[in-house]
Regions:
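C-terminal regulatory domains involved in ligand/effector binding and gene-expression control
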Residues: 1-45, 50-179
Length: 179
C-alpha cells in the first residue's frame, strides 16, 4: 500500500479542536504540536516524518522527546539554499478575541500571551525571547502540555489522547491542577 503524504502547512489543517490535525481525504494525523515545535525550534524546515497511526505519540507530553531524537539523529545542512519568508511589514490575523501578529525582525523572536478562562491559568505573558535551537531545547521543549479533565472523554471517544497518563501532561480540574 502506497503511503499517504501531505505537507505540514496551514492549508492542510483540518481540525483544531483540543489538538491540531493535518490531513486530506485519505488520511489524517493528529496532535502534531510537539513535533512541529521541535522541528521549528531546532531549525529544521525540510524533513519527512513517517507514522503508522492517526495520532503522534504524546511521549513525555512535551517537545523534549522529539528534540532528543533530533539531536541523536543529527541535523544535516542541504546543498540548496532554503526559501525564506521575509516579513517587511506587520501582519495581524484576528478571530474573535484571538489574534496573532507577525512583525519584521532579523531574529526569530516570540512573545506569547494567554488569557484562559480558568482560575489557575488566567492571563499569562512571556516577553519577547530570541529563540535559538539551544535555548529552545533547554527552556521551551521541556514544557509539558496541559488539558482539562472535562475534555478527556471527548478526546478518547475520538480515538485521541490514548497515551495520556498522569506523568505526561498537567491535568486541570475546575478548581486547579489534579496532578
Amino acid at each position: 500500500e502506497k503511503p499517504t503524504r501531505f505537507p505540514a502547512r496551514a492549508e492542510w489543517v483540518t481540525d483544531t479542536t483540543l489538538a491540531t490535525t493535518l490531513g486530506n481525504e485519505d488520511a489524517s494525523l493528529s496532535t502534531i504540536e510537539h513535533l512541529v515545535a521541535a522541528l521549528r525550534g531546532m531549525g529544521i524546515d525540510n524533513c519527512t516524518v513517517e507514522v503508522s497511526g492517526p495520532e503522534l505519540p504524546i511521549m513525555d507530553g512535551s517537545a523534549g522527546s522529539f528534540v532528543y531524537l533530533i539531536q541523536q539523529a543529527g541535523v544535516r545542512a542541504q546543498a540548496r539554499m532554503r526559501r525564506r519568508i521575509v516579513i517587511r511589514r506587520p501582519i495581524e490575523v484576528r478571530d474573535g478575541n484571538r489574534w496573532v501578529r507577525v512583525l519584521p525582525s532579523r531574529d526569530f523572536k516570540v512573545s506569547v500571551e494567554i488569557d484562559y478562562p480558568h482560575p489557575v491559568i488566567g492571563r499569562q505573558e512571556l516577553e519577547s525571547w530570541v529563540i535559538s535551537p539551544e535555548r529552545f531545547a533547554r527552556e521551551i521543549a521541556p514544557a509539558r502540555t496541559f488539558g482539562f479533565a472535562r475534555d478527556i472523554g471527548l478526546l478518547q471517544r475520538q480515538g485521541l489522547a490514548l497515551g495520556g497518563r498522569f506523568d505526561n501532561f498537567v491535568l486541570f480540574g475546575e478548581e486547579g491542577p489534579v496532578n
